[in-house]
Amino acid sequence: MGLSDGEWQLVLNVWGKVEADLAGHGQDILIRLFKGHPETLEKFDKFKHLKTEADMKASEDLKKHGITVLTALGAILKKKGHHDAELKPLAQSHATKHKIPIKYLEFISEAIIHVLHSRHPAEFGADAQGAMNKALELFRKDIAAKYKELGFHG
């Protein structure tokens, strides 16, 4: 399941593009998530009222949350699989407070892959997509293990 050094490099190369515009990428990813899986919107009291893509694009709260999500994910990706310290508080909040099912993390992973490919087709070809998929799968597997430790089977 681990990634090679080359695969991590592909992940981090495209992540540099994400970090250059966290707000834009985060907004696009969350909009893609909410449009593709409207049930995920119900987990966000702040966003439940956002019914259209125009509403979502106009929401400063959604933009801020996108920055929060991608900042946390970036910190995890930069650890190249050695992310236990970063994962623990994230798993704690997502399992006990927000009760976010692992399935929803799969949905946002799909949204991330889609948005990165649409925004950076040259830098996010098949090899980079494969590497990012592996990195996100590793993240989900490890957070699922933390969920289990916390007694959450979402």
Swiss-Prot record:
The gene is MB. It is found in: Cytoplasm, Sarcoplasm. The keyword DNA repair does not apply. It comes from Peponocephala electra. The lineage of its organism: Eukaryota, Metazoa, Chordata, Craniata, Vertebrata. This is Myoglobin. O2 binds at H65. Belongs to the globin family. Signal peptide: none annotated. It catalyses: Fe(III)-heme b-[protein] + nitric oxide + H2O = Fe(II)-heme b-[protein] + nitrite + 2 H(+); H2O2 + AH2 = A + 2 H2O. Monomeric heme protein which primary function is to store oxygen and facilitate its diffusion within muscle tissues. Reversibly binds oxygen through a pentacoordinated heme iron and enables its timely and efficient release as needed during periods of heightened demand. Depending on the oxidative conditions of tissues and cells, and in addition to its ability to bind oxygen, it also has a nitrite reductase activity whereby it regulates the production of bioactive nitric oxide. GO terms for molecular function: heme binding; metal ion binding; nitrite reductase activity; oxygen binding; oxygen carrier activity; peroxidase activity. Monomeric.
